[in-house]
Amino acid sequence: MADPLSIALRFALYTDLMVLFGLALFGLYSLRGTERQSGAVLNFKLLLTGTAVLGALLSLAALLQMTKAMSGATEWEELFPHIKMMLAETEVGVSWNVRMAALAMIAVAGLLTSRSPTGSLWVVTALSGVALATLAWTGHGAMDEGSRRFWHFATDIVHLFAAGGWVGALVAFALLLRAKKVDNHGSVKILARTLTGFESAGGVIVATILVTGIVNYLFIVGPQLDSLADTTYGWLLMAKLVLFTAMIGLASLNRFRLSPHLEHSIGHGDYTGAAKALRWSMATELAAAVVVLGLIAWLGTLSPEVEMAMQ
């Protein structure tokens, strides 16, 4: 098992890059025209640039921790040559360089969301997608070879995109549901419209996560369940599935009950109670998503094959 610091850094990096990708994507499919301008609905300049800078710092910390763990070096003088080798001679190093370049460009593009909001969001979405995709090179797919490796990577990347879309949307809705936002009638109308607009996107996201999750499981473990039951990987995976099911339940509650109730309440001019109920539901769903990301970070450091062989 990896050390707690490595897991914590993986968790923070996964969360950061998913939020970055998902927020930019949300701005494109949910907001319209001038609503995309930074500060009109969401402060994209601060959110995107800040998240990109944080992602770069986390990537640097993760690289140092990974190199330290692999080399056993304890002093900087010993560690530096290993870092140079990691960056220049490994696929993980290449993916890290690509991620850092993408994040640097995102930080600049994020500053332009006031002048050219739509163009900037397109640029950030594309570049953050690249940055998010590089995380696949730190997962189980990196251990495969040939065509299996290609398809495992492809499945991982699509899975990351779908998860990022969901997490980013939850963060966006959490920001839109803040108390000072729901006091404004115009903001509440935008919230209701974006909730309705997310219904189709949310369905596609959940379906994609389910399909790619099953395919990933088959790549990593194979068509077996019994031998996995007594492993740490198996228990963590079960906890992840329980939480994911709870998230689907909350998303269904939002879609079929709470969102329509909010829209109906707006028509009657009294939407405070509906907004509060939706806020609590979204907060619970977001909390579950955070725990799921923590489990994903931990699962990525485990080898189920080794655990099953030791039984």
Swiss-Prot record:
One of its GO terms (biological process) is copper ion transport. It is a multi-pass membrane protein. Its main location: membrane. One of its GO terms (cellular component) is plasma membrane. It is found in: Cell inner membrane. The keyword Membrane applies. The keyword Repeat does not apply. InterPro entries: CopC/D, CopD, Cu-R_CopD_dom. The chain crosses the membrane at residues 11-31, 46-66, 92-112, 119-139, 157-177, 201-221, 233-253, 282-302. Keywords: Cell inner membrane, Cell membrane, Copper, Membrane, Plasmid, Transmembrane, Transmembrane helix. Exact function not known. Involved in copper resistance. Appears to be involved in copper uptake in conjunction with CopC. Belongs to the CopD family. This is Copper resistance protein D. It comes from Pseudomonas syringae pv. actinidiae. The gene is copD.
